[in-house]
UniProtKB/Swiss-Prot annotation:
Enzyme Commission no: 1.5.1.5, 3.5.4.9
Family that this chain belongs to: Belongs to the tetrahydrofolate dehydrogenase/cyclohydrolase family.
PROSITE patterns documented for this protein: THF_DHG_CYH_1, THF_DHG_CYH_2
Protein name: Bifunctional protein FolD
Entries under CDD domains matching the protein: NAD_bind_m-THF_DH_Cyclohyd (cd01080)
Subunit architecture: Homodimer.
Designated gene of the protein: folD
Originating organism: Shigella sonnei (strain Ss046)
Function: Catalyzes the oxidation of 5,10-methylenetetrahydrofolate to 5,10-methenyltetrahydrofolate and then the hydrolysis of 5,10-methenyltetrahydrofolate to 10-formyltetrahydrofolate.
Length: 288
């Protein structure tokens, strides 16, 4: 069996085009364009690349993109003050603070300072709690992007045994909640999990998010499984690979996401979707 490739790049472009059309319709109707504030503290090269891609995506769909590039020396108090100002700014629908933050700044305190209705990353405890209670508002971008991929490929998830490898706050934990909503029987594995291979071999739907190149051998994959590889790892030779041994896994899976070009583009596309949602559902004047 040769797996069908889940083309995240193409689906992400579709999502962005749909958002762009809705933005044009808003402007034609006399409403303002959605606004996203992107905050970067310090000069981490990887963060600079991520931030640039998010700003570019914003501008492509017709959003107002506001950039705040703060020096490494920025204090926690100064950053919180900026977030307070952006919370109060009626032209800003989404606030994104790029992680990791420099030493001395409390990530949790900063993320919790963003108003839940402007938390387009979906990391605020309120939004995570809503997802847990089956009443999601703004949903974490990578898990929601993965659900969008499954939906666009008409993959029926009800009753599947889903296994999530990795229990991070950004992917693993919220992903498990999305999968419960999608009707899966869900297992989350982590560093203390015994006999990881057993869990992988029984997974109808496998989502791997650990950040270790080739962590899951292809021969562990169940015949006909759906494999979603969230890992983005750069090898010493410059090649970018996922957490799953792609060539071997693709021989056994029914569907698989490539790296690059699978989950990565969906994260940014979902950020754009979330910003439009925040604008339309939480910040537009009611009744218009």
């Amino acid at each position: 069996m040769a797996a069908k490739i889940i083309d995240g790049k193409t689906i992400a472009q579709q999502v962005r085009s749909e958002v762009a059309q809705k933005v044009q319709a808003r402007i034609a109707a006399g409403l303002r364009a959605p606004g996203l504030a992107v905050v970067l503290v310090g000069s981490n090269p990887a963060s600079q690349i991520y931030v640039a891609s998010k700003r570019k995506a914003c501008e492509e769909v017709g959003f107002v993109s506001r950039s705040y590039d703060l020096p490494e020396t920025t204090s926690e108090a100064e950053l919180l003050e900026l977030i307070d100002a952006l919370n109060a700014d009626n032209t800003i629908d989404g606030i994104l603070v790029q992680l990791p933050l420099p030493a001395g700044i409390d990530n949790v305190k900063v993320l919790e300072r963003i108003h839940p209705d402007k938390d387009v990353d979906g990391f605020h405890p309120y939004n995570v709690g809503r997802l847990c209670q089956r009443a999601p508002r703004l949903r974490p971008c990578t898990p929601r992007g993965i659900v969008t991929l499954l939906e666009r490929y008409n993959i029926d998830t009800f009753g599947l045994n889903a296994v999530v490898i990795g229990a991070s706050n950004i992917v693993g934990r919220p992903m498990s909640m999305e999968l419960l909503l999608a009707g899966c029987t869900t297992t989350v594995t982590h560093r203390f999990t015994k006999n990881l291979r057993h869990h992988v071999e029984n997974a109808d739907l496998l989502i791997v998010a650990v950040g270790k190149p080739g962590f899951i051998p292809g021969d562990w994959i169940k015949e006909g499984a759906i494999v979603i590889d969230v890992g983005i790892n750069r090898l010493e030779n410059g090649k970018v690979v996922g957490d799953v041994v792609f060539e071997d896994a693709a021989k056994r899976a029914s569907y698989i996401t490539p790296v690059p070009g699978g989950v990565g583009p969906m994260t940014v596309a979902t950020l754009i979707e979330n910003t439009l949602q925040a604008c339309v559902e939480y910040h537009d004047p009611q009744g218009e």
